């Protein structure tokens, strides 16, 4: 009898918690006033104004902006689509409820490095589904291409690529690893001879190596990574269908 009572109380508690949990319907997010979810309206307004006033001073024409940013980088050609950015836009959500918004929240804008989140997620799903057995496995086991044939590159694991500690050496899609964010005041002819660290020993932000992770993930999945993201993440969570994840052209 005591066991039954405990079970009933526990079940009642779980049911009560679930009944209080709000999850927005597809395309129909409910709204609440800031003070209803614990925000101080004056402080929130100040934060929103700060966000609006902090707009980048760079050109809204992102083709021009990217070219200006990469002027000092060899092989800085744009090889993917761009889209002009719009007015400053934001959305504040608390507990699943929209509490504030500004600008055109339905506009689709470029988000740049958030694609790294997408990329690490689809690699994680590959691990979950057994397509990758262990993040500490050598990538060469799964991707037997020239990209991982050298003595140095053959040591690289999935973990190294995910953490940007691989120090992979090579050229991918006509862009050599040394050309991304090169050190200042170093002649281009000297960049190719920069010291190389053992995989896993040193962190370095490098988009060529991030793209190598995308290439490697593509070899494992054997289908477009945006499709993988859509089927395994975006559709199940009820995301809109207006997002795009473009590869290189």
Describe the function of each predicted region.
Residues 5-15:
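Sec-dependent N-terminal signal peptides
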Residues 34, 38-45, 87, 113, ...:
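Soluble non-cytosolic domains of exported or imported proteins
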Residues 129-168, 192, 221-249:
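Active-site helix/loop module of the DD-peptidase/beta-lactamase fold
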Residues 40, 96, 110-135, 161, ...:
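Active-site SXXK
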Residues 78, 85-86, 92, 138-142, ...:
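Extended ligand-binding groove/face enriched in aromatic
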Residues 17-104, 129-132:
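N-terminal leader/targeting segments and the immediately adjacent pre-domain N-terminus
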Residues 1-3:
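N-terminal secretory signal peptides that target proteins for export/translocation
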Residues 99-103, 171-249:
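Catalytic-site signature segments of enzymes, centered on catalytic residues
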């Amino acid at each position: 009898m005591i066991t039954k009572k405990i079970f009933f109380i526990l079940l009642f508690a779980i049911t009560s918690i679930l009944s209080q949990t709000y999850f927005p319907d597809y395309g129909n997010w409910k709204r609440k006033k800031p003070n209803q979810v614990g925000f101080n309206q004056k402080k929130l307004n100040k934060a929103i104004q700060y966000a609006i006033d902090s707009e980048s001073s760079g050109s809204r024409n992102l083709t021009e902006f990217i070219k200006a940013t990469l002027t000092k980088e060899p092989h800085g050609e744009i090889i993917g689509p761009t889209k002009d950015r719009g007015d400053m836009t934001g959305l504040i959500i608390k507990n699943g409820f929209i509490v504030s918004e500004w600008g055109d929240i339905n506009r689709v804008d470029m988000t740049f490095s958030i694609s790294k989140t997408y990329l690490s997620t689809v690699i994680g799903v590959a691990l979950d589904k057994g397509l990758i057995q262990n993040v500490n496995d050598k990538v060469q086991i799964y991707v037997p291409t020239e990209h991982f044939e050298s003595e140095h590159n053959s040591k690289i694991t999935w973990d190294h690529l995910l953490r940007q500690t691989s120090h992979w050496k090579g050229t991918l899609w006509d862009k050599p690893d040394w050309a991304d964010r090169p050190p200042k005041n170093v002649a281009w002819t000297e960049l190719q001879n920069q010291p190389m660290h053992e995989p896993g020993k040193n962190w370095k932000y490098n988009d060529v190596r991030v793209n190598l992770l995308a290439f490697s993930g593509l070899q494992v999945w054997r289908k477009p990574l945006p499709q993988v993201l859509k089927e395994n993440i975006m559709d199940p969570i009820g995301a809109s269908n207006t997002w795009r994840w473009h590869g290189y052209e």
